[in-house]
């Protein structure tokens, strides 16, 4: 201080007043400015665009000030203690206060035995009559003196001249107190001190080489730790066991409950520190200032939960703020306004500054957005959110599909597209393709001895390549037409299988299109049904379908016009009918109506107008090509179409690629485009060979979906997915993660299950399944020592909680056709990893519903509270 280094103190009970201390004490009143451009009042200083400060009083009666402390109580309101260079502590005031108590205290002096500099002062926050002073070292005196300001002065005691040589005025008129209430810290220097809020008689002092905690109830004992960081000790107002101190450019953070070493040491600064201060309105926010700097560094100490016994350091976010352009001499946090401080420069210019909080956003796995700023927490909702499922984010779609058990129907595979909402044509095509693949693969495996069924999952492209050289061509005339022109089409066993996978044919040798066309008519797909009938040379059926479609209530009257046009079909190349149809077909909006005329007007073997109509379903284009293209044309067309599907990530292309490496490439493009790892996972698990399932991309999609289910707290759904995965891919079944071993011999208790045939694996070996008499394992199979007893029912583990009603001898028989049952959860072994007590899971759950402590006598372990995940509730029944 001493005129060259001003300091700032906020009034404890007046949030609009502060004092600047250097060679004199200046009291200021801070108020809001009318406007940034308004003129200042006489004697006012502009602190910021919003605030100004007005000088209220000046006190220059106390020279050689080294430290100042403001009286913590409301009355008297302007009482300050000033520590001087000679060790005296003087009580003074700012302004006029006619309170008799204040008049008795003002001017009172507290004089040590030997003169030396007073470094720090601290009022006791609870007993405000106690004032602690920290002095420099003297070989024959104490350095920590605690004065009682209410004690009577002793004018009869002679004061040596060396004590009063710096005192102003006549020393005989002063109220002098020379006997402190407590004397501490002999033969050492005190550089900083503060009272501990948790106890009014605990004082923390930064001595010359250690931090010491003095207990005034027993002054002969102290707790201390050797350290160089003894300057600027200050207690966190929000966490009374946390203390900060500094030395040179380094700050140490202490926990008084574990005082052996700092719990944290902040990054060392290149320049010496001059001040550290905790923010009174913000938990864990520490501000530091270095010499000759215009930067204040802030350290935000995050509160992150750590496991019991873990000594990991807390997370710290460091940032710097610049309140002004000039060097900063000191700063002070505002006592009530959040993150607000006033800084002062060496030339006494001041600035009112607010540290703006970092805005943090949190986006939950359920797409809820939270915005935290300062003490406010905002929940953000999207305006004008579309109600259509097509407008939803893919994460929302996947979450809803998971709730509907999407992908888990392995019998009627096609139904999975209904579980997905039946609003995505690509998903519909995918699941129908997988359904047909499963259906025909099972039929082929039953009819043949080899693994020809795997060829079905390789896709139509691979199937048709296997028939190269065996394809036969046939000429057929139109059905239901007077024209006898022949149409060339191609057939083979593999092409017939391809048509079945496309849905154009049913199982068996019967090639009747009737059932398929009827199903299309029921779904209202009149144009598609008519086109497929036409492609199968039944022009009369196509006309009938169009007329039927036009006659329905919601039918398109244009269908009658198209039917009339079809009825006039002629195969003459230069006819007016062919010329007009070639021109006008491009004006039709429906792609199937367009390709009907493209087919009729095409040259034999040249059907580009049909094959490259992108609005037409891929399965229909593939089926058409299998009928009318020869082997060479078919191979070239499939190669080109496959590349298009892979680049676009179109799931309809799975019909061509199958669940092969090409299929993985296609799914990769689909996932890159949509982010739908859910469909990718279920699709690849449906029938992919093991080498494809081991592809790192497939494994990444599967693990991503599992993590997504966990993030949504869909733990049951994730378990169902794991079970589904292990059925379709036995190699993915994980090893047992938990096993129970005997305390005496160390052998696994699960060995006892090996003598019982067909015993369920996993946790069933630790519980009771099947017959209550056959499955009792109450002793270790290795050493025959009894298993531990349940802490509640006192029955040896291995016994069921209760016998299953209706159990009979028939229960002892094992039905291999049924799934192996897992033991009931209530019978599982359960134990606490802390106290090692436990019992039947059902009993433990019932106990901890009403109790917090362990059921074993004299054990105070709070077992359930140690399991943080036990407090989480599955969210599978919560709708978004």
Curated annotation (Swiss-Prot):
A zinc finger (C4-type) spans 740-786. GO terms for molecular function: zinc ion binding. Zn(2+) 4 binds at residues 835, 837, 854, 859. One of its GO terms (cellular component) is cytoplasm. Pfam families: MIOS_a-sol, MIOS_WD40, zinc_ribbon_16. One of its GO terms (biological process) is positive regulation of TORC1 signaling. Zn(2+) 3 binds at residues 832, 835, 863. Keywords: Lysosome, Membrane, Metal-binding, Repeat, WD repeat, Zinc, Zinc-finger. This is GATOR2 complex protein MIOS-A. The gene is mios-a.
């Amino acid at each position: 201080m001493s005129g060259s280094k001003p300091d700032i103190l906020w009034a404890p009970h007046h949030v609009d007043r502060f004092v600047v201390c250097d060679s004199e004490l200046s009291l200021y009143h801070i108020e809001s400015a009318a406007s940034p451009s308004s003129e200042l009042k006489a004697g006012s200083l502009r602190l910021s665009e919003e605030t100004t400060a007005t000088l209220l009083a000046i006190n220059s009666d106390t020279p050689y000030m080294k430290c100042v402390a403001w009286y913590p109580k409301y009355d008297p309101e302007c009482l300050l203690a000033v520590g001087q260079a000679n060790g005296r502590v003087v009580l003074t005031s700012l302004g006029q206060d006619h309170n008799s108590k204040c008049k008795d205290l003002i001017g009172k002096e507290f004089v040590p035995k030997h003169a030396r500099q007073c470094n720090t002062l601290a009022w006791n926050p609870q007993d405000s009559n106690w004032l602690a002073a920290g002095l420099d070292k003297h070989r024959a005196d104490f350095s920590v003196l605690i004065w009682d300001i209410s004690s009577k002065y002793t004018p009869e005691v002679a004061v040596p001249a060396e004590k009063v040589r710096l005192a102003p005025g006549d020393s005989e008129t002063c109220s002098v107190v020379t006997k402190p209430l407590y004397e501490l810290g002999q033969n050492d220097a005190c550089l900083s001190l503060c009272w501990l809020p948790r106890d009014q008689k605990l004082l923390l002092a930064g001595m010359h080489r250690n931090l010491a905690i003095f207990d005034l109830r027993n002054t002969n004992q102290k707790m201390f730790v050797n350290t160089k960081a003894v300057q600027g000790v200050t207690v966190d107002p929000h966490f009374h066991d946390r203390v900060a101190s500094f030395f040179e450019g380094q700050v140490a953070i202490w926990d008084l409950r574990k005082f052996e070493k700092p719990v944290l040491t902040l990054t060392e600064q290149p320049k010496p520190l001059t001040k550290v201060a905790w923010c009174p309105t913000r938990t864990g926010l520490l501000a530091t200032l270095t010499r000759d700097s215009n930067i204040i560094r802030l350290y935000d100490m995050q509160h992150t939960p750590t496991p019991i016994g873990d000594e990991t350091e807390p997370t710290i976010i460091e940032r710097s703020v610049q309140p002004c352009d000039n060097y900063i001499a000191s700063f002070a946090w505002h006592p009530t306004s959040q993150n607000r401080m006033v800084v002062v420069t060496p030339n006494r210019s001041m600035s009112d500054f607010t540290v703006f909080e970092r805005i943090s956003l949190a986006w939950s796995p359920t797409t809820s957005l939270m915005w935290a700023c300062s003490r406010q927490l905002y929940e953000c909702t999207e305006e004008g959110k579309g109600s259509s499922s097509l407008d939803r984010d893919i994460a929302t779609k996947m979450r809803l599909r998971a709730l509907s058990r999407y992908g888990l129907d392995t019998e009627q595979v096609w139904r999975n597209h209904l579980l997905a909402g039946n609003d995505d044509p690509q998903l519909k095509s995918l699941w129908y393709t997988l359904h047909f693949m499963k259906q025909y693969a099972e039929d082929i495996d039953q009819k043949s001895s080899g693994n020809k069924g795997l060829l079905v999952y390789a896709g139509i492209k691979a199937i048709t390549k296997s028939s190269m050289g065996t394809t036969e061509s046939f000429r057929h005339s139109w059905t239901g037409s007077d024209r006898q022109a022949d149409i060339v089409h191609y057939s083979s066993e593999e092409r017939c299988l391809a048509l079945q996978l496309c849905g154009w044919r049913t199982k068996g040798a019967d090639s009747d299109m009737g059932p398929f066309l009827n199903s299309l008519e029921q779904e209202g797909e009149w144009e598609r049904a008519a086109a497929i009938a036409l492609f199968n040379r039944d022009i009369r059926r196509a006309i009938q379908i169009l007329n039927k479609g036009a006659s329905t209530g919601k039918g398109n009257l244009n269908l009658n016009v198209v039917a009339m046009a079809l009825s006039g079909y002629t195969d003459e190349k230069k006819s007016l009918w062919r010329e007009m149809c070639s021109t006008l077909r491009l004006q039709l909006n429906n792609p199937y109506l367009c390709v009907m005329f493209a087919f009729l007007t095409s040259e034999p073997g040249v059907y580009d107008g049909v094959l490259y109509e992108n609005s037409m379903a891929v399965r229909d284009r593939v089926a058409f090509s299998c009928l009318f293209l020869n082997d060479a044309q078919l191979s070239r067309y499939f190669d080109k179409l496959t590349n298009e599907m892979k680049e676009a990530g179109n799931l309809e292309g799975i019909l061509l690629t199958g669940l092969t490496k090409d299929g993985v490439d296609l799914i990769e493009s689909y996932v890159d485009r949509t982010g739908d790892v859910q469909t990718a996972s279920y699709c690849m698990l449906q029938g992919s060979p093991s080498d494809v399932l081991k592809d790192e991309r497939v494994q990444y999609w599967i693990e991503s979906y599992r993590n997504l289910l966990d993030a949504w707290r869909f733990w049951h759904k994730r378990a169902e997915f794991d079970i589904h995965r292990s059925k379709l891919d036995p190699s993915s079944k994980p090893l047992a993660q938990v096993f129970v071993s005997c305390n005496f011999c160390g052998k696994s208790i699960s060995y006892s299950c090996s003598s019982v045939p067909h015993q369920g694996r996993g946790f069933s070996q630790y519980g009771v399944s099947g017959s209550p008499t056959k499955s009792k394992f109450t002793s270790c199979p290795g050493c025959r020592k009894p298993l531990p007893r349940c802490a509640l029912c006192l029955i040896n583990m291995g016994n069921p909680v209760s016998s299953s009603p209706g159990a009979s001898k028939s229960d002892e028989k094992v039905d291999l056709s049924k799934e192996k049952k897992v033991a009931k959860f209530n019978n599982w072994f359960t134990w606490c990893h802390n106290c090692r007590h436990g019992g039947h899971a059902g009993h433990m759950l019932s106990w901890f519903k009403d109790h917090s402590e362990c059921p074993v006598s004299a054990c105070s372990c709070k077992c359930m509270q140690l399991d943080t995940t036990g407090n989480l509730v599955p969210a599978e029944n919560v709708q978004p």
